[in-house]
Amino acid sequence: MCLLRQEGKEDGILGKSILRMIIDLPKNVENIIERLKEHGFEGFAVGGCVRDSLLKKTPKDWDITTDALPVDMKKIFKKTFDTGIAHGTVTVLMDGVGYELTTYRIDGNYSDGRHPDSVSFSKSLSEDLCRRDFTINAMAYSNKKGIVDLFDGRKDLQNGIIRAVGDAKKRFD
């Protein structure tokens, strides 16, 4: 189970967890998030691209997390290919660049240490962020909402700390 550092808020997406800050999203990432929104879904840049942007580094790639299911993503975007449908991942091609879109999910056990044995799709960004490995990779961003940082990843980044989301022993055992 993932415990959020938010007193009295199980969802944790309100209050201090959202930091108003601007990350310069590539135009295609903005377009993907906007198209998701136009179709009634959320979309956030997530993980290493948010971390790298906060470090003033150019991200190697941009991952997007959403409450849209793969079937929805394939209807919304013209050029897609299945990257990991069982894990909720579809790659959207724009201007020759691939952007991985993954449905919010809750992961089961990891018998190979890398890929979950099972996944359950979710409608909750906070549940999706709970499955991430480290606090510095468990941050999400959209121009509208700002940075969603439920586990103090930004603080850990500033202090040079690598900390697991949840119980490190259980996560990496």
What residues fall within each predicted segment?
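Catalytic cores of the polymerase beta-like nucleotidyltransferase superfamily
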Residues: C2-L4, E10-D173
